[in-house]
Amino acid sequence: RESGIQEGLCLVNAMHITSSVFINDNEKGLWQDYINWLERLAPHEPIGQYLHNRTGEANGDAHLKRQIMGREVVIAVTGGKLDFGPWEQIFYGEFDGQRPKKVLIKIIGE
């Protein structure tokens, strides 16, 4: 509403390599399913399994989890409102937590 855009696109971007923005349903079981699924795909331990961790950081898994979940989402703006389907919401996924991070929001349209 603050942008005044009636028709266009809204970009929401996680501005860090170990965080993600995605769209899904806000349901507790689904959240736990995501946590379990991501941990199976890219387990945090053993730390030594990731070559990236040889740099002194222990977040190789966080980089992979971000890649799986994605960097950004784009939502249509229709009639001045974000055009979501039923149950859709925007979520921020934090996979490391070692430093402050930003989210970029850009609204483009008329």
What are these regions (language model features)?
Residues 1-110:
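Active-site histidine-anchored catalytic micro-motif
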